Amino acid sequence: MRKIWFRSIASLVLCLMGLAGSRARAQEFPVQTKTLKNGMKVLVQSDHSIPNVALYIFYRNGSRNEHPGTTGLSHFFEHMMFNGAKKYGPGDLDKVMEANGGSNNAYTTRDTTVYQDWFPRLALPLIFDIEADRIANLRFDPQKIQSERGVVASERRLRTDNDNGGLLDEQLWATAFIAHPYQWPVVGWMSDIEHWTMEDLKHHFEMGYSPSNATMVVVGDVTPEEIFQLCGKYIEPITPHAPPPPVTTVEPEQLGERRLVVHKPAELPLLLMAYHGPKTNSPDFYALNILRTVLFQGQSSRMYKQLVDKEQIALEVSAFAEPAFDPTAEEIFVQPKQGVDPAVCEKVVYEELERAKSTAITDQELEKAKNIRLVEFYQQMRTISGRANTIGTYEVFFGDFNKLFDAAKNYAAVTKEDVQRAAKTYFGANNRTVATLIPENEQKAKQ
């Protein structure tokens, strides 16, 4: 069944790419929009295939909107928004959601905090009541705040301080960015986590989690009319606050390679690299995605074949770039084998990057990468949750959800020359930061 579905999707992608060449747009589905009086934008896409609903709220507030002393607050509110408000107390949100057959989650990035609800359509009024309560009446109970502060501190210790990959990644971003707030870790610095004040919390919440700073996306067994009516009843009466001040700091051009070395107890070394790249809403977005796919994605990628298959010096290699409002980092991850000097892996990475800059990729590589990207794109759109996240991501990061309908056309338009130009533009030696983790036992052996 899975193979049959994959073939059908692949055929659909090829068909859409052909249509894209004729300036047709990828499968459009109606999305109705409305901006509430308090500034929240609401997007609704009806899908009556199953009696379920996905409701996502995107707040344009992340670690980018913090400063020294308040780092980690956006992530902290990812936790606090589940810890009680005026009508629904601590733990009630999860209990009510589960009792009605639903579930919820949230995630925080450098640019956004996103809250996710999945539930049967019968629970629509209840979910709107819950969301309105925690937006308007979040509880700032000192005892609960102190308890959750401890939870976040423990999370930081687990995922960063005691995780070699997390620690090295934190050090990489703190070194690659010297001016822009992308240098802050999303979880926050431990000293800040320990010293946030009540005033810090209330100010950050009012600033970042106002309806005027949010976009709601609802996908599923709903009609736009009923969603707008529910918004009018539950969400629109909430008083908005001033949004976060604009981030005006521009990261200065990097004029030379930066390097850092971390020594930690570890079984394996680790190599990370960051090249300064563009923001998500950039003309180079699609060309960079194709380049990243050719070089790093899957066992048939250039880097995997060289590092893992041919040279047999690495266990894993990958690359990624997070959605970002401002120029961000193209990050490369290499897991060397035990006993392998990361510098050996580093040399191979540079050789492959230089090859991509000096010689255009092949026609076959280009078409394969386009197919991979489009299959991924349409797989995301299969479910109501994937569609809600994609619609919201395009609305928030590209400035218009309608741009998602141009994805097939934009991928089809990418040429080999575009990919080569992207490699030359962003993957220069002066534009990179290199972070290496050396196991302490190896360091002692060299001394």
Regions found by a protein language model. Give the residues of each.
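His/Glu-based metal-binding/catalytic segments typifying zinc-dependent metallopeptidases
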Residues: R157, A174, P243-S300, N410
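Short, polar/flexible loop-turn hinges at active-site or ligand-entry regions and domain interfaces
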Residues: N83-G84, Y88, I135-Q143, I361
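M16 family metallopeptidases and their MPP-like homologs
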Residues: Q45, I50-F76, P90-I135, N164-S191, ...
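Active-site His/Glu-centered metal-binding helix of metallohydrolases
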Residues: L73-M81, L291
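Generic, well-ordered alpha-helical scaffold segments in large soluble proteins
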Residues: I130, R134, E155, H204, ...
